Structures are given as C-alpha cells and as structure tokens.
Amino acid sequence: MRVGIVGGTFDPIHVGHVVVAANVHAALGLDETRVVVAGNPYQKDPPVAPGEERFAAVQAAIEDLGIAGIVADDSEIRRPGPTYTIDTVEQIDGEVFLAIGNDAANNLSTWHRVDELRRLVTLALVRRPGAPSVELPGWTVSPVDIPMLDVSSSMVRERLAAGLPVDGLVPPAAMRVVHKYGRYAGTR
C-alpha cells in the first residue's frame, strides 16, 4: 500500500493544506493520504489551539473535501510527549511518501532520527511556483507541483484576531469548528 503523510500543526487548517493533500494524493497515485495533526512538535512553538480542536477542524475539512483515501489522522496528538515524524512513519505498513515543502526540506538535517527517516520514506517534495530549488542528497524524492497560494496559518490567525474575514482561506467546514471553539480572538 502506498501511503502519504501530510503533517502539520494545522493551527488552523487552511486551503493551502487541503490543496497539498489533494495534489500529493493524486500526483503520486496514493492509496491513502493521512493528514496528520502534530501533537507537541519539538521544533516549533506550541500551537494556539489544543490538539483535539485542531484535529476536529482538520477532520471536518477532509470529510468535506470528499476525496476517497484522504483521511484525518490524530495519532500524534494521542501520543504523549514531543512528536516526531519518524515515530509516525514507523507505525505505517506500506511504502511511505512524506509531503514536505522546500522550506522544511532545507531543515531536514535537524529532524529527529533523520538517517532512519531517509531510509524509510520517499519525500513528496511539494514545489510552489517560484520557490527556490533544494538539494536533497541521499533522499528519494518525488516532486509534486502545486499552484501558488498565498496563505498561512499565522496569516489566518492574525486576520481572525483582527476581526477580518477569512472567506476563501479556510475550508468552510473547518471554519465552523473554529467558530464552535472560538479559540482565535475575533473569530468570524
């Protein structure tokens, strides 16, 4: 079985995340693509919203997307302590494709147990138009081109905090979850 991992804090999920999942799934002909919500990522600041809320929004967005084989995955938020990609990969029985953008690919050398990860996954290198190329010696890479979308979770949080609309930036089903919890000030 060919399994993709699209991981992130998804704080909150936005349309760019959904585009990545859909394009990686289709371009690589994957049997399953797991949108994995990070629990306590060791290289990032703690998320604003708790894992359960972020997962609920991801689950709503993915269900609304309605593409067979793309699923929301809460395995990392259920795991205590720092979450590492290698631990998630080791739980998968099949050929694993790890979706990663150029920015994160440049920092792979700092990842936990990176040598093991290199042996276990094919990188689904998500390339945005105009993004600089990245050299990944020793990695097996399958490039996936996606359309340029100028959206980020931090931008969405800032707009919500300022009371500005995020229509078109956050999947409507996910936005309903965000409204329910009211985690981001000024949510509308």
Language-model region placement:
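Nucleotidyltransferase catalytic core that binds NTPs
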Residues: 1-188
